[in-house]
Amino acid sequence: LRGGRAVRSSENRLPRTTADRLALVALSGLEEFRPVYDGLAGMEVFNPSPEAMRRPQAPTPGDPLRRDGSNIASVLERLRHSSPETERRVEEYLRAIVPGTRSVRSSAMSGWETLEFQQDVSGSAGPWSFPASAVSDGTLRALGVLVALFAGTGEALSPVGVEEPEIALHPAAAGVLLDAIRDASEHRQVLLTTHSPDLLDSSTILPGELFAVRSVGGTTEVGHPDAAVRFAFDESLFTAGELLRADQFQPEPEEAVSR
């Protein structure tokens, strides 16, 4: 499609499309395009807010996680009953990202739900319990990102987007966070936005997994990294994080899409 008109198609007959409407909606009536439409329509995008996660909430079914993570206590309660393995995976990564954390669970309080963390305390024989109000932004943000990555909606694992997952996290936790993202991507498509060189400081990241984003003249251009960046990757000259620090990420001019 270009300008709302079909240039080339695998189908003999197509519904009418216009330049000011998303063509995929019209095409979703065709069996061949329906899975694409369902997958994109089911995409979830999250930006967990520690402030929202601290507030006690009325209990909900916990399906799905809200964009700001405000109902995360209900989601954890759902996972405890319906998917204990997912709950364990979330806690394992949380322990690796936030040393000293033992577990997290939903806690009822006068008809409301909140989070309760079990954490090691120096000199104590066992872990202490802390409410969400006493836990750092970084811990809450890490929990929100992990639940967004692994929880899913019902039986589905739709594509998931997370905005700047590194916010409020210690730079040393970036490697574990990347491991969690890789793990989640084995089961669902994961899309991230990031400004963090620390998160991208890994030789396992390939140029085909990255999109460069630039603001040019009031428009946003998005595309795969340009030839200079790809050469640096191919020759193992720099990691993605090092290139980002040097402000060398540019979208390929021929394929950049403006918004």
Model-derived segments and their meaning:
Residues E164-H170, L199:
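ABC ATPase nucleotide-binding domain "signature" loop
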Residues V176-R259:
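C-terminal lobe/lid and adjacent interdomain/linker elements of RecA-like ASCE P-loop ATPase modules
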Residues E44, E113-L115, E209:
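Short beta-strand micro-motifs in enzyme catalytic cores
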Residues P99-R102, P165, E186:
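Proline-centered flexible-loop/turn and helix-kink motifs
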Residues R102-L115:
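Long, charged, glycine-rich C-terminal linkers/tails
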Residues L1-A96, R102-R105:
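Electropositive, glycine-dotted interaction segments
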Residues T114, Q119-A125, S129-V162, P171-V176, ...:
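GG-anchored amphipathic helix commonly corresponding to the ABC/SMC/Rad50 NBD signature/C-loop
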Residues L1-S10, L115-V121, G217-D226:
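Short, well-ordered strand-loop elements centered on a beta-strand within folded domains, enriched
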